[in-house]
């Protein structure tokens, strides 16, 4: 559990230090990645590489699929709902396990949200995500 929290904390901090799209959830990308920056203006290639490494290590160690998504604005949408919408519409996590995690950065709104599938609660509750 400590390893999971450490990896997710590292992912959150990496994304937060990096400081596009609209409030509607972007279409699911055709190719899987652990980091999505839709207009390419926030995450440097080295930051994306770091996030990819943390995401792969976390999934290998725990089976939990964690992705980072950068958007510009949420246009008033609740960050928790937006992150959950990404989990559900993109199918983040293993089918039937609901063990996906989305680390969402809304750059223009200056918001960071960690959204978790219900299968992640046994490892990391929403309260623990808030502590990060």
Q: What is the meaning of each model-derived region?
A:
Residues 2-132:
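A structural boundary signal for the start of the first folded domain, especially the loop/turn
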